[in-house]
Amino acid sequence: MGPATPSSLMPYFDPPLPCSFDHEGSKPECYAEHARVIPAVTNFMPPSSVVELTETTPPLFDPISVHRISSDTIVKVEHYHHYVEALNLSMIRAMTTIPVPEVRQIVQHKTFTYLVMEYIEGRTLDQCWSELSHIQRLRVAQTLRGYIDQLRTLTRAVPGTLDGSACVGPFFSAIDAEPFASYDELVDWYNHKVDVVKKMRKAPPDIGTFDDSAPLVFTHQDLNMRNIILANDGTLYVIDWGWSGFYPEWMEYACMARYDDAPQSWKDLIPFITGPHEDMFNLLCDIGWALEVGYMM
């Protein structure tokens, strides 16, 4: 048997976007049929060339395997068949005006996925924040607030990822955050983590329970300064949508507030960008032991 031949794929939505995400059927499995990848009809470049170029160019970031293979193209390599970021980017481009990189091709080879995307000329906020004036920082915050408002127009009755795969993110355990069939299942999962930290005496005595009144909205889940690019033309791009999915609207605040090493001038703007949800952030921090250590309990 000869070596495996790379295959070329593309994001696919049925029915085509824009549309409602609340479909009848077995949930969340029905979303995997709605949002998936299919064989590409045409290729941006030969799939074998994508693989070869990533093997001969050094990664831009460590440990993330992102390779710049031409002046306007990068390839992000995942060590498993991970398509949800391509689906997320395609949905965002179709249903919002949030600037994100264009997905040009998906290549599958052996156990790797190669996401071929547009390269954005510019600097991430962690690289240029100190050079921005107070007014410029406020403009960035106002722009991001508008992006969050757009994301919150994308709703779904069932939490989780766009393609029905397991939930991933800073406040999900590594192995037991399987797709949830309902919002109630998600809340029960989190409240079980509360019970675990109480039982193991790893939580403050006044720890609360999870708020299930907030709507499920599309959430980036890693909106840190390294994932926001101020392009050379002044456009503010958002990158790295691999953790995104439909979660309670307070989740965006929690995921942004968790970065202790961010400048205070940035942290002060987070409540304005996402709305203040410090109570839920504190609760997520309080169950950290159950998420990271006691997730099998």
Positions of predicted regions on the chain:
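Charged phosphate-binding loop/patch that engages nucleotide di/tri-phosphates or the phosphate backbone
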Residues: 24, 33, 272-297
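Short, glycine/acidic-enriched loop or turn micro-motifs at the edges of active sites
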Residues: 121, 225, 243-244
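Short Pro/Gly-enriched beta-strand edge/turn motifs at strand-loop
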Residues: 46-51, 85, 208-211
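Phosphate/pyrophosphate-binding loops and the adjoining catalytic core of nucleotide-dependent enzymes
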Residues: 1-65, 156-160, 293-297
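ATP-binding pocket architecture of kinase catalytic cores
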Residues: 20, 51-176
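An alpha-helical support segment within catalytic cores of ATP-dependent transferases
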Residues: 137-142, 150-221
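Active-site Asp-x-Gly
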Residues: 183, 213, 217-218, 231-282
